[in-house]
């Protein structure tokens, strides 16, 4: 398969593919004294990617190439980001017949500070597959006895990274160079799901036996303060509860507390394990069903079903003085659902409102003091 990104508008290419393209064009310039407007690189599946080069310059034995990140129709925070690659060509000892490639990060590329990732602590966040792709494509340009030193940098990478998961993963100072195939596929959750998994690895490496699964940043904020736990113990799952819980089980996790805002967590009580509103939204119906077990009031049921937000329903239940009873029931049902689907894991559930106040809870796993 060949994808020509000079004309392609649906697919995009990864930060890893940007780094490979920049490195190849820079080394090609050093070897052939010719600037390339585009490069043809191979990914690890031997698929050809044709990627445009924005700019290229040289100074003696060093060349500098610039590639602009393109995400296709799967627009993300790194779309149109500039990636700079510097390549220096060096001679080895006269008797050497080796071909060497060294890869480093520069400004705007993150540095790993936590165990559990694919990269050693203290190293630049350039994942193994992009490193392998760089080596695969550059090695053919080298003669025996030559070494290419590759350094990748990203203007504003530090600022961009603050809008990604990198700070939570312990990757500081910039973004990561990622990608297994070099191709960004549109409207696919697969890459995003995979990006969430290192959180579990880091928690396991740090020896945490009870993990706290939350929907996102708000859940993380209140879980830290309410439960008095470390951030590395908290796993943000976004909407992918089924996927993340399944992977946690595969990795040997035995005790999980589900913690989060009522609007997300009540869906789990209904057996909904992808909580994105485009996939499913039965919050009002679930809350109505559990309220009906405590109160036979048709007008109340209508109010709940017609409410615009979960917070509005919380206010209605508080006025009727059944708020905690309803959410304790829902918490219990969440635990029952999870235990049924993932029988090798002990579950607990804590549901909070928009301000982090506990509405309901059910403990089967280890308690938090």
UniProtKB/Swiss-Prot annotation:
Give any Pfam family that matches. Answer: CbiD
The main enzyme category here is: transferase
Q: What is its EC number?
A: 2.1.1.195
Which UniProt keywords are listed?
Cobalamin biosynthesis, Methyltransferase, S-adenosyl-L-methionine, Transferase
Q: Does the UniProt entry include the keyword Methyltransferase?
A: yes
**Reactions it catalyzes:** Co-precorrin-5B + S-adenosyl-L-methionine = Co-precorrin-6A + S-adenosyl-L-homocysteine
List, in alphabetical order, the GO biological process terms annotated in this UniProt record: anaerobic cobalamin biosynthetic process; methylation
InterPro entries (UniProt xref): CbiD (IPR002748), CbiD_sf (IPR036074)
Organism's domain of life? Archaea
What are the GO MF terms of this UniProt record?
cobalt-precorrin-5B C1-methyltransferase activity
Q: In which pathway does it act?
A: Cofactor biosynthesis; adenosylcobalamin biosynthesis; cob(II)yrinate a,c-diamide from sirohydrochlorin (anaerobic route): step 6/10
Q: Does the keyword Amino-acid biosynthesis apply?
A: no
Provide the family line.
Belongs to the CbiD family.
- HAMAP family recorded for this chain? CbiD (MF_00787)
State the NCBIfam families in the record: cbiD
Q: What is this protein called?
A: Cobalt-precorrin-5B C(1)-methyltransferase
Taxonomy, top ranks, is: Archaea, Methanobacteriati, Methanobacteriota, Methanomada group, Methanococci
């Amino acid at each position: 398969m060949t994808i020509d990104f000079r004309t392609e508008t649906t697919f995009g290419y990864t930060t890893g593919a940007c780094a490979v393209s920049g490195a190849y064009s820079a080394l090609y310039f050093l070897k052939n004294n010719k600037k390339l407007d585009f490069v043809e690189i191979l990914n690890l599946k031997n698929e050809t990617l044709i990627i445009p080069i924005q700019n290229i310059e040289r100074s003696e034995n060093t060349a500098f190439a610039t590639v602009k990140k393109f995400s296709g129709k799967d627009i993300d925070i790194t779309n149109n980001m500039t990636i700079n690659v510097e390549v220096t060509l060096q001679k080895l000892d006269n008797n050497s017949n080796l071909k060497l490639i060294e890869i480093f990060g520069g400004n705007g590329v993150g540095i790993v500070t936590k165990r559990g990732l694919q990269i050693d602590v203290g190293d630049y966040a350039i994942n193994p597959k992009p490193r392998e792709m760089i080596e695969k494509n550059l090695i053919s340009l080298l003669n025996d006895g030559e070494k290419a030193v590759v350094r990748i940098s990203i203007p504003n990478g530090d600022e961009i990274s603050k809008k990604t998961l990198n700070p939570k993963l312990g990757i500081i100072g910039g973004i990561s160079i990622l990608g297994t195939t070099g191709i960004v596929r549109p409207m696919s959750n697969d890459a995003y799901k995979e990006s969430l998994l290192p959180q579990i690895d880091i928690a396991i490496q740090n020896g945490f036996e009870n993990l706290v699964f939350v929907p996102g940043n708000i859940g993380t904020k209140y879980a830290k303060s309410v439960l008095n736990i470390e951030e590395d113990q908290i796993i943000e799952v976004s909407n992918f509860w089924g996927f993340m819980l399944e992977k946690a089980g595969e990795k040997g996790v035995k005790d999980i507390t589900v913690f989060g805002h009522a609007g997300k967590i009540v869906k789990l009580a209904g057996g909904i394990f992808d909580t994105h509103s485009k996939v499913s939204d039965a919050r009002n119906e679930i809350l109505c069903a559990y309220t009906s077990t405590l109160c036979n009031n048709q007008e109340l049921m209508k109010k709940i079903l017609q409410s615009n937000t979960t917070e509005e329903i919380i206010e209605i239940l508080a006025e009727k003085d059944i708020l905690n009873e309803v959410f304790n029931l829902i918490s219990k049902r969440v635990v029952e659902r999870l235990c049924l689907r993932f029988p090798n894991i002990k579950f607990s559930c804590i549901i909070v409102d928009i301000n982090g106040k506990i509405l309901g809870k059910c403990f089967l796993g280890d308690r938090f003091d």
